[in-house]
Amino acid sequence: MSQGVRRAGAGQGVAAAVQLLVTLSFLRSVVEAQVTGVLDDCLCDIDSIDNFNTYKIFPKIKKLQERDYFRYYKVNLKRPCPFWAEDGHCSIKDCHVEPCPESKIPVGIKAGHSNKYLKMANNTKELEDCEQANKLGAINSTLSNQSKEAFIDWARYDDSRDHFCELDDERSPAAQYVDLLLNPERYTGYKGTSAWRVWNSIYEENCFKPRSVYRPLNPLAPSRGEDDGESFYTWLEGLCLEKRVFYKLISGLHASINLHLCANYLLEETWGKPSWGPNIKEFKHRFDPVETKGEGPRRLKNLYFLYLIELRALSKVAPYFERSIVDLYTGNAEEDADTKTLLLNIFQDTKSFPMHFDEKSMFAGDKKGAKSLKEEFRLHFKNISRIMDCVGCDKCRLWGKLQTQGLGTALKILFSEKEIQKLPENSPSKGFQLTRQEIVALLNAFGRLSTSIRDLQNFKVLLQHSR
């Protein structure tokens, strides 16, 4: 080989390496450049949310989610899909529920609270038996006797009003308590036609959108030639604020769920022990502006918008919990008091945020039209909560139902300001009530958003280090 050829080959190698570095640097800079600045339809900037979440909210909300009151969620994962015959499953075999056998469930939960506090938590053998069920998409229903017995008492603190969600009947034999800490939201392998059908139904039929308008990157939509989605956003910008907000909430929820899957991805499995962690390739596939034709940054901005909406709801509902009559009751007086103190501390932080979304800008037209639009808004969202029963993966269904109910509870709060202001200090109110399930869903859903924003910061660092 001649010297000239060798020099040419070496030069090409250097050029390729330089091009790779430039590409990675460009990717990082584009992601950061496009997911920044002031959000549409509000006066808040992304950097302020990042700092507020990192230093004030995330550490406290994570701690709150570990408390008994907030870690147990009752859900019916056996409700049939009301819209189509669902036959989709996770691509991983363990993406279904494997609850503990009936014989392993402590008798206290079935016999009421007659033997309350008399038994210790599940012994080691029971825990080992149930841990076999906690794999990938499987739901682990392991609970302590004391926790299960306390749930019956919690029920008497609950009441309800009109909802933005289709709530599960907690009295149904199919409803079961799930320990959320034993069932973290993460990648299960659930994907393909079944998953796309769920999101397609949500976007195409429940976002105030005519069938002639298609959202970008929809694999179930007909080919649109050179249309890169601009026609969709032209249509979206022409909508009233309320309908734009609705779409952004759904898109933000979708983005948050996708971030959780990217951040807790099955990296490898050795001798039956899975290893979970962030997957940069999956993150780029879902959010890189080049790979998503500009959609990724829009989705992430909608995540921040959703965070603002739920943050605002927490600040507005604080007076409900500040009353002495409201207890976060589990039966452990000392822990209950500590949990309420922590929750009130979080509420104080939410009220201190200076750039809240102004919900009064919504449904502010003539009373008749505003009332009709608000009801349409509520029914559309309620229908979306029903679609969550069509998710083929039980773990995905669990977290989908919880986060949908959490957002529905946030909307209920934002549109009940007058009722909250009139709450009596020392007696229950018929004007506004939250069930325990709504409270658990609200705080855990916001915790998921807080985690998503934290995960996004981590991915930015990983992209920077990969240059």
UniProtKB/Swiss-Prot annotation:
Residues bearing glycans: 122, 140, 145, 383
GO molecular function, one term: oxidoreductase activity
UniProt-reported outcome of changing residue 393 to A: Some decrease in P4HB-binding. Efficient homodimerization with wild-type protein. Loss of catalytic activity when DTT or P4HB are used as an electron donor
Residues that coordinate or bind FAD: 186, 188, 199, 251, 254, 286, 299
Induction and repression of expression: Up-regulated by inducers of the unfolded protein response (UPR).
Stored InterPro entries: Ero1 (IPR007266), ERO1-like_sf (IPR037192)
Entry GO terms, CC: endoplasmic reticulum; endoplasmic reticulum lumen; endoplasmic reticulum membrane
Activity regulation text: Glutathione may be required to regulate its activity in the endoplasmic reticulum.
Disulphides: 81-390, 90-95, 90-130, 100-262, 207-240, 393-396
Cofactor(s) this protein cannot do without: FAD
Chief location of this protein within or outside the cell: endoplasmic reticulum
Pfam families: ERO1
Post-translational modifications reported in the UniProt record: N-glycosylated.
An annotated GO BP: insulin processing
N-terminal signal peptide: 1-33
EC number: 1.8.4.-
Alphabetical keyword list: Disulfide bond, Electron transport, Endoplasmic reticulum, FAD, Flavoprotein, Glycoprotein, Membrane, Oxidoreductase, Redox-active center, Signal, Transport
Tissue specificity as recorded in UniProt: Highly expressed in the digestive tract, including the duodenum and lower digestive tract. In the stomach, highly expressed in enzyme-producing chief cells (at protein level). In the pancreas, expressed in islets of Langerhans and, at lower levels, in enzyme-secreting cells (at protein level). Detected at low level in many other tissues.
Membrane-protein topology: Peripheral membrane protein
Annotated compartments: Endoplasmic reticulum membrane
Keyword Flavoprotein: yes
Class of this enzyme: oxidoreductase
Purpose of the protein: Oxidoreductase involved in disulfide bond formation in the endoplasmic reticulum. Efficiently reoxidizes P4HB/PDI, the enzyme catalyzing protein disulfide formation, in order to allow P4HB to sustain additional rounds of disulfide formation. Other protein disulfide isomerase family members can also be reoxidized, but at lower rates compared to P4HB, including PDIA2 (50% of P4HB reoxidation rate), as well as PDIA3, PDIA4, PDIA6 and NXNDC12 (<10%).
Complex and partners: Homodimer; disulfide-linked. Heterodimer with ERO1A; disulfide-linked. Also detected as monomer. Homodimers may be somewhat less active than monomers. Interacts with P4HB. Interacts with ERP44.
Protein family per UniProt: Belongs to the EROs family.
Protein name (Swiss-Prot/TrEMBL): ERO1-like protein beta
